[in-house]
Amino acid sequence: MAKAKGPTSSKSNKPASPPKPSAPAVPAAGGATAAEGSPRTIASPPSDLNKVVKRTSWAAGDVIHRIHPSKYAADEFNPGPHGNSRFSPICNAAGEPIPTIYGGSTFECAAMETVYHDVPFAAGFKTIAKRKIRHHHHSQLVPSAEMVLANLSNKALRKIGIPRADLIDTEKDLYPQTRKWAEAIHAHCPDVQGLCWVSRQDDTAQAVMLFGDRLPSGCLTHTAPSVDLVVDDATYSALVQLADDIGVKITGK
């Protein structure tokens, strides 16, 4: 007996191929997912910051090394609202700019956080133009009284609820979000006079950022005259040595 023929069709009887799945979204650190071409989103500050922020102190008499534009005096706070740093410019709860000073526990830290901040983590020959260093001073400040600072070290950040990768180790595209944390700490922790963390650029030292409206007038004094980074021979030699340590050559005039 001949086998019965099945129904004929001009189309193939093969099942249609399922559509290719799209690549899964990669979650950003902290659990948020970044849309393509836009910065990822970090966690927002919790409402109970005053309870979870660990305090640390900067002792009276301990030097803060500051590298700053020559238009500012050694102890003069940056008034804001201009600039683009990790924790400044920021405003208080009334929307008024909070004056700030950045510094480090060593000269090398201050230089890495300013002069060499944008040197890439890449092997090979790297340069920085000498003109970018000009018109900057190195100042050494000491507080006349102990300062209370928010501790942003790894252990302390676990209690706050944000990893270092999201607050300290981010690139500039996330600075608008990291500044929200500085504003929140200022708003919720009335005793805190600034922030302190292990420097991203020099992890052998501490970086600090001070809230100018939380420090009494005259509490910062300089222990030595401010010196020009290029004009002062000893300071420029130290910069050249640090440049060599990180594989950078200072070029130009």
Which role fits each region the language model picked out?
Residues 2-15, 20-88, 122-253:
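Active-site and NAD+-binding cores of ADP-ribose-processing enzymes
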